Design a protein with these regions (language model features):
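Predominantly cytoplasmic-facing regulatory/coupling regions of multi-pass membrane proteins
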Residues: 1-80, 138-256, 295-318
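Transmembrane helix-loop junction
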Residues: 66, 101, 231, 276-277
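Membrane-interface alpha-helices at helix entry/exit sites of multi-pass transporters
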Residues: 74-77, 94, 108-122, 281-291
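Extended non-transmembrane interhelical loops and adjacent amphipathic helices
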Residues: 78-104
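Alpha-helical membrane-spanning segments of integral membrane proteins, especially the hydrophobic core
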Residues: 81, 85, 112-125, 154-162, ...
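Transmembrane alpha-helix interface/packing and boundary motifs in multi-pass membrane proteins
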Residues: 87-89, 247-268
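Membrane-embedded alpha-helical segments of transport systems
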Residues: 87-91, 115-137, 290-302
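Interfacial segments of multi-pass membrane proteins
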Residues: 103-109, 268-284
């Protein structure tokens, strides 16, 4: 009940801010004119960018499973990714994603699939934190402090430090990962997970670098997708400013526990807050964030649910 209640509260708060904005009529007119002028090409591009980012995610999943000689078609990997999205839609911080990813693996390999999902999450968090660390240098924290309170700058410095520390911790993890898995494999109280640690040891540095590279590419695709949607709605904002705002928003979504179906509330609040230093068209920013959520979160979850119910794929054998 907490999640829906929070969503209602945030929605009311945002509605109040937008409805009382003196620029509401002007922003709405700007959006309507730009949609009419730009047509449907840019929304189509943003849809293709959604498919591209999940294609990249499917390549990552195929790559990491290949480390333990699990070979599959790209299309099968993509279906597993979408299935994971359908489960993650109703779980905190998308923790249910592993269920969809491993549901088609043999029973004795589900533990390995779960461990690989966690590893993939670590890769994603490390990239989001790295991007946030860069974004903090581009972000206009002074303007945000003037809009909120004088202590905002101090909080931004703390969050920047947190992003740097998490990034540094992830780098250390990737450097020592093999020794860490050997330690876990030899730990007496973790003996029953020996096969999982042994599988994780097969993730070499080449695989890690490829996964990091693909995750960086996927994140840049997301940033570009936001910029395309904002341009379609007539929001006058540069790509660098979009990069800063989106990177910080993704970082916020990582560190704050939430559920996908109420995540839209946080996206609204983050977008309204972070982009307010770059543009006055906050209605366009809010609509853009909603469109991206529908494309990147809701639509993949629906596709995944469809495949799970109507088009089940065969179990994958090594």
């Amino acid at each position: 009940m907490v999640g829906p209640a929070l969503l209602i509260l945030i929605s009311y708060h945002l509605y109040h801010k937008l409805s009382t904005s003196p620029q509401l009529s002007f922003d709405l007119n700007t959006i309507q004119q730009n949609i009419s002028k730009n047509g449907m090409l840019l929304p189509l591009v943003s849809l293709l960018l959604m498919l591209l980012q999940w294609t990249i995610e499917a390549l990552k999943w195929r790559k990491i499973l290949g480390a333990v000689s699990f070979h599959m078609k790209w299309a099968t990997s993509l279906k597993m990714i979408f299935a994971g999205q359908s489960f993650s839609f109703i779980t905190p911080n998308r923790m249910g994603e592993f269920i969809g990813r491993v549901v088609y693996l043999p029973s004795e390999k589900k533990g390995i699939g779960t461990a690989f999902t966690v590893y993939n999450t670590v890769v994603q968090i490390s990239v989001y934190c790295f991007f946030a660390s860069i974004a903090f240098y581009f972000y206009d924290a002074t303007s945000l402090s003037k809009k909120l309170s004088s202590s905002t700058g101090e909080w931004i410095e703390i969050l920047q430090l947190v992003a740097l520390l998490i990034s540094f911790a992830c780098i250390i993890f990737f450097v020592i990962q093999k020794r860490l898995f050997i330690f876990l494999m030899n730990a007496h109280f973790l003996k029953k997970f020996t096969n999982i640690w042994s599988a994780c040891m097969q993730i070499n540095h080449e695989t890690s670098i490829v996964m990091l590279g693909l995750t960086i590419l996927k994140t840049l695709v997301i940033v570009f997708q936001y910029w395309v949607v904002f341009s379609w709605l007539g929001v006058d904002i540069s790509f660098i400013s979009t990069f800063a705002g989106v990177s910080l928003m993704l970082f916020g979504l990582v560190v704050i526990p939430t559920i996908s179906f109420v995540e839209i509330g946080l996206r609204w609040e983050f977008s309204y807050l972070l982009f307010s230093v770059y543009t006055s068209n906050l209605l366009g920013i809010t609509i853009g964030a909603t469109i991206i959520w529908l494309l990147n979160v809701v639509l993949p979850a629906i596709i995944g649910a469809f495949w799970l119910i109507f088009k089940p794929i065969d179990r994958i054998d090594p």
